[in-house]
């Protein structure tokens, strides 16, 4: 379905995968993008079929897509402008058989990305940290455990964004309607993708 929809869609694609947190992050990113763009489609495993939304899209549209490992197995041309892998833990091994195969399939989300594209990754996941260090595209890490020189991180109950030239407070955790470290990670991933 993803490949068929992508062939018929227009505009930029922001795609999210991971073992946990996909639906929350997709919803958060969809709401963020609706503040900036008029034509936003939130699709995928979240309940809105990508194939139904694709014919309505224009070049100005933004698609926020939740993508499962099953869907990633069949991609060919699918090219997100921004991708995210939230985490990788043992799951669906009945289908993928080994953890190595599951990791390989999740990493396919970056298959067609170029140096002009971005992948957002969880720095606290050692698999993703190693993967990100070897990617030939722009990588933006997020962390709930440590301050990052570049990326998004949680410190003093505030979510921060930092790069070589600036440090910006994104929001206070008390201002969010969701709680828990895992949800703060979802917020950081969504903010990084936006």
Where are the language model's segments positioned?
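Adenine nucleotide phosphate-binding catalytic loops in nucleotide-utilizing enzymes
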Residues: 98-100, 137-194
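Phosphate-binding loop of NTP-binding sites
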Residues: 1-123, 127-138, 153
